[in-house]
A protein has these predicted regions:
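A bilobed periplasmic-binding-protein/Venus flytrap-type ligand-binding module shared by bacterial periplasmic
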Residues: 1-16
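Secondary-structure end/capping motifs
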Residues: 13-89
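Conserved C-terminal helix/tail region of periplasmic/extracytoplasmic solute-binding proteins
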Residues: 83-108
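Short, structured secondary-structure boundary patches
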Residues: 8-12, 73-75, 105-108
Length: 108
C-alpha cells in the first residue's frame, strides 16, 4: 500500500495541500498501471543507468499491489506487528492512522 505520511497539524493547516498529495499518489499509480515504462523515464533522472533500466520491470511485477486504499484489516495487522516486534506499546485504531476525510480520494 502506498503511504503519504503527514501530521494532524498539516491536515488542519492546509487540507488542500494534503488532498493534492493524495490525488498525486492515486494518479501516479493509475498512470503506472496503464504504462509501467513511465517509471523508466523517471528512473533515468534519479538512478544510475543500470538501476533505471530495471525499474519498469519492478513496477510491472508490483502492479497487483498498486491499490491506494488502506483497509482496517491492514492497519490492524500492522499495529499487531508493531506491538509484537516491540516498535509500539499499544495498538492504534484505524482512525488514528488514516485521515478519514481523504478516503474518498482513493477512488476518485
Amino acid at each position: 500500500m502506498p503511504v503519504l505520511a503527514t501530521s494532524d497539524h498539516a491536515i488542519k493547516r492546509d487540507p488542500n495541500m494534503v488532498a493534492a498529495g493524495v490525488r498525486a499518489v492515486v494518479k501516479t499509480q493509475q498512470a503506472l498501471k496503464r504504462d509501467p515504462s513511465l517509471a523508466t523515464r523517471v528512473g533515468k533522472a534519479l538512478f544510475p543507468p543500470a538501476e533505471a533500466a530495471l525499474i519498469a520491470d519492478v513496477i510491472a511485477r508490483d502492479l497487483p499491489y498498486y491499490d491506494p486504499t488502506i483497509s482496517e484489516a491492514a492497519v490492524d495487522g500492522l499495529s499487531r506487528f508493531a506491538q509484537a516486534s516491540g516498535l509500539a506499546r499499544r495498538s492504534v485504531s484505524y482512525n488514528q492512522v488514516v485521515a478519514l476525510e481523504f478516503r474518498h480520494l482513493w477512488t476518485a
